[in-house]
Design a protein with these regions (language model features):
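C-terminal tail/sorting-segment detector
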Residues: 121-143
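Short loop/turn segments immediately following beta-strands, especially the blade-tip
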Residues: 21-31
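Glycine-centered coil/turn sites that cap beta-strands in beta-rich domains
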Residues: 31-73, 130
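Short, glycine-anchored, charge-dense loop/turn motifs used at functional sites
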Residues: 70-82, 122
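Conserved beta-propeller blade signature
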Residues: 9-12
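Glycine-centered tight-turn motifs at strand-turn-strand junctions
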Residues: 78-117, 128-131
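Residue-level detector of Asp-centered blade-edge/turn motifs that repeat once per structural unit
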Residues: 3-7
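Short loop/turn segments immediately following the C-termini of beta-strands
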Residues: 15
Length: 143
């Protein structure tokens, strides 16, 4: 078994040949210096917001380049908490609106009340719980 670190594609060698699938997760990084969000800005025609199933890797707002022990809070510009996830706690299979899978986090654009967020700027406040390194990423949602 091998994982392509940048795309998250998993390769499995069997006696009948090689099989691969896109997992959606990626390898973790050593620090937060290369974290980025996409799509950004999030435009209506991208059709990535509001889905309840985070297992569809083509939907949602993603953060890539995370370390292996992070806590991420999403707030609006006023400071209202919109979402929160922690490594090794909030998995994509956990039926949450925000989850972390290895070096990738995925958010479906819903707030803590399970409503799709309004147009605006949202802050992803990333904290590495091991090194105390922090980083803030801004994402613009246009509805």
């Amino acid at each position: 078994i091998s994982i392509e670190k940048t795309t998250g594609e998993v390769f499995i060698a069997t006696e009948n040949g090689l099989v691969s699938f896109i997992s959606g997760g990626t390898s973790t990084q050593g620090d937060l210096s290369k974290v980025y969000a996409y799509p950004n800005p999030v435009r209506p025609e991208y059709d990535v917001l509001g889905y309840s199933n985070l297992n569809n890797i083509n939907k949602g707002v993603k953060l890539k380049g995370l370390t292996d022990n992070v806590n991420i809070k999403i707030t609006d510009v006023v400071g209202n908490l919109v979402g929160e996830a922690q490594s090794n706690v909030n998995y994509r299979s956990s039926s949450k609106n925000f989850a972390i899978d290895g070096g990738t986090a995925i958010w479906n654009g819903k707030n803590l009340s399970n409503n799709i967020v309004a147009t605006g700027v949202y802050l992803f406040l990333i904290s590495d719980l091991s090194t105390f390194e922090t980083k803030t990423i801004k994402v613009l949602i246009v509805r």
